[in-house]
């Protein structure tokens, strides 16, 4: 009897898991999670926020933040609706007291108390929505992406299944493929930690997963199908968000073209060309409209992105990693506990099916994509773990099919006792992986998020200043206040003036941003950019200071122990509270707790 796994139920399972995970996540990973997605969306939805230089320069497409703007807008109108409902209820209570119990002291006290309810309800709902709506949006997107990875695994299984196995438990193997893929994707450490965070790389991986499912893995048999057109549209749209995603599609497209040419299917080749043109037109037109909406003029950010990252040396401003970074660091972190299976998959066929040409084998194509992409990404000077995250669907597919291949090869000869032991311990790594990711998602660097929530809760604030490495905390996407007169932080803009300088490569190592100047000589920076902290009478006559001492001062413990604690002695500042942030940190400047100083009147 067939033991089919209900795929629709799987989507619900993934969705619940990712929603819980997203709602529990309260830590900071990297600045782009907030500053390149939520902050511009907040700026457009609520009319205030801080746009980084990338948005002023036109380097980013607004397609990804637009999703969050839609969520924010719904939240805003939901809050207004609730305010109107509560206001109506308050008015009815007022009418009741005035006409029925006009002499009741308690009634009038209740009316007085309720006057602030509508505004408070609106503020509460709006703030909670601003915090949690993006999390739920990413949870839904993550579930869609991971569900399509499972569908892709099922599709590849059916395509590569040896027909001679039809009567030999193929239904059981089918269920095994789906179940293994579910466990592999849901329990993957980096998926658990990263996929529901509002990074463009998460969005890129999700779109890539969906597009790969609709891709024609027969190398041309289904080129004329609507599913293939959907794959091309999503794929080209993804490239417009992250140009390096083209590394994937150029390789898969190259395989398809080569197979069509070798088999002399010229009509199919012509159909492919037409489909690519149509898909590109749809994607580019859509993206142009979205970016015109944000920027107010026609622009193609992907061209500026390529210019900044490929034709200039300015990307090195954000760090240069060794050539083997992705091999020895990114791959183990992104692939997680399935890394041994991923490596082993390159040394076995993964399928018994014989194809008319080896070039048609989907697993060969996938291995080529992984190998060449890792090489190409390794050639880029600036490297981060998340840059290879779009390859995650390939990592999972190769790991799952390699695990099944090993199970088939050695499972039949293993003893019952061995198989029982294996079935019991096989859950250890997935469970440990999920627990470890949740500990990081709830504890490590939690202070940088908690401090913004705390500042939001303070009723009346005149000014806030952050003396710490730039973009160390979220901004209005978590603070959500436009009633603070001064809200500032130390900056770190790159040397855009070197973009067209032929000597940029030589000058770049000597460029220092504001954060660099701060930590290079803290006391000098304070003297040059801040007035005396003790008395206004000590200010230099006529001198303009970059910053004024704020009512609330936010710093890391490292700066406090190095300088600020002694510097603020006998000043009007007292330590109001502190938040745990990390036990250890790769950046010493961000080590320890986050401390809030309050300047007393």
UniProtKB/Swiss-Prot annotation:
Primary localization: endoplasmic reticulum
Pathway as given in its UniProt record: Glycolipid biosynthesis; glycosylphosphatidylinositol-anchor biosynthesis
InterPro entries: GPI_mannosylTrfase (IPR005599)
Gene Ontology molecular function: alpha-1,2-mannosyltransferase activity
Keywords assigned by UniProt, alphabetized: Endoplasmic reticulum, Glycoprotein, Glycosyltransferase, GPI-anchor biosynthesis, Membrane, Transferase, Transmembrane, Transmembrane helix
Source taxon at top rank: Eukaryota
Keyword Plastid belongs to the record: no
GO (cellular component) term, any one: endoplasmic reticulum membrane
Enzyme class: transferase
KW Transmembrane (keyword) present: yes
Pfam families: Glyco_transf_22 (PF03901)
Sites carrying sugar chains: 309, 521
Disulfide bond sites: none
Membrane topology: Multi-pass membrane protein
Signal peptide limits: none
Role description: Mannosyltransferase involved in glycosylphosphatidylinositol-anchor biosynthesis. Transfers the third mannose to Man2-GlcN-acyl-PI during GPI precursor assembly.
Protein name: GPI mannosyltransferase 3
């Amino acid at each position: 009897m067939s033991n089919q796994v209900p795929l629709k139920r799987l989507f619900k399972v993934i969705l619940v898991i990712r929603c819980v995970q997203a709602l529990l996540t309260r830590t900071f990973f990297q600045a782009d999670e907030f500053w390149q997605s939520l902050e511009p969306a907040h700026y457009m939805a609520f009319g205030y926020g801080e746009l980084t230089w990338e948005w002023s320069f036109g380097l980013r497409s607004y397609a990804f933040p637009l999703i969050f703007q839609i969520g924010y807008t719904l939240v805003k109108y939901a809050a207004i609706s609730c305010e109107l409902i509560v206001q109506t209820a308050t008015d009815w209570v007022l009418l009741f007291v005035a006409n029925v119990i006009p002499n009741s002291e308690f009634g009038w006290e209740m009316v007085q108390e309720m006057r602030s309810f509508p505004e408070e309800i609106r503020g509460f709902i709006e703030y909670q929505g601003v915090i949690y709506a993006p999390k739920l949006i990413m949870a839904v997107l993550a579930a869609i992406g991971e569900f399509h990875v499972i569908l892709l695994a099922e599709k590849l299984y059916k395509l590569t299944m040896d027909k001679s196995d039809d009567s030999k438990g193929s239904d059981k193997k089918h269920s095994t493929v789906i179940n293994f893929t579910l466990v592999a994707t849901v329990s993957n450490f980096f998926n658990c930690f990263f996929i529901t965070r509002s990074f463009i790389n998460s969005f890129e991986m999700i779109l890539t997963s969906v597009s790969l499912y609709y891709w024609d893995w027969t190398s041309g048999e289904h080129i004329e199908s609507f599913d293939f057109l959907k794959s091309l549209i999503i794929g080209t749209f993804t490239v417009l968000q992250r140009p390096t995603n083209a590394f994937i599609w150029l390789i898969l497209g190259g395989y398809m073209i080569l197979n069509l040419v070798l088999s002399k299917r010229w009509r199919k080749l012509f159909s492919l060309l037409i489909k690519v043109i149509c898909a590109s037109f749809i994607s580019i037109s859509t993206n142009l409209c979205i970016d015109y909406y944000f920027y107010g003029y026609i622009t193609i950010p992907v061209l500026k992105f390529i210019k900044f990252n490929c034709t200039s040396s300015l990307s090195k401003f954000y760090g240069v990693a060794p050539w083997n970074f992705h091999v020895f660091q990114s791959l183990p972190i992104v692939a997680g506990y399935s890394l041994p299976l991923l490596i082993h998959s390159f040394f076995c066929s993964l399928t018994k099916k014989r194809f008319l040409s080896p070039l048609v084998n989907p697993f060969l194509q996938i291995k080529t994509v992984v190998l060449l992409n890792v090489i190409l990404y390794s050639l880029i000077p600036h490297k981060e773990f998340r840059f290879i995250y779009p390859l995650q669907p390939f990592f999972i597919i190769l790991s799952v099919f390699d695990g099944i291949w090993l199970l088939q090869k050695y499972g039949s000869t293993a003893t019952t006792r061995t198989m029982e032991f294996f079935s019991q311990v096989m859950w250890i790594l997935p469970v440990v992986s999920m627990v470890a990711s949740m500990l990081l998602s709830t504890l490590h660097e939690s202070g940088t998020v908690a401090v913004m929530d705390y500042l939001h809760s303070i009723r009346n604030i005149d000014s806030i200043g952050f003396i710490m490495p730039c973009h160390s905390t979220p901004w209005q996407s978590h603070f959500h206040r436009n009633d603070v007169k001064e809200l500032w932080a130390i900056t770190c803009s790159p040397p855009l003036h070197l973009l067209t300088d032929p000597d940029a490569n030589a000058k770049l190592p000597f460029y220092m941003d504001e954060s660099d100047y701060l930590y290079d000589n803290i006391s000098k920076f304070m003297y040059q950019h801040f007035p005396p902290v003790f008395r206004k009478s000590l200010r230099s006559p006529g001198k303009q200071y970059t910053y004024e001492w704020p009512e609330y001062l936010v710093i890391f413990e490292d700066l406090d122990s190095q300088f600020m604690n002694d510097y603020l002695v006998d000043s009007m500042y007292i330590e109001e509270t502190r938040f745990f942030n990390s036990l250890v940190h790769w950046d010493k400047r961000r080590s320890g707790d986050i401390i809030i100083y309050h300047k007393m009147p």
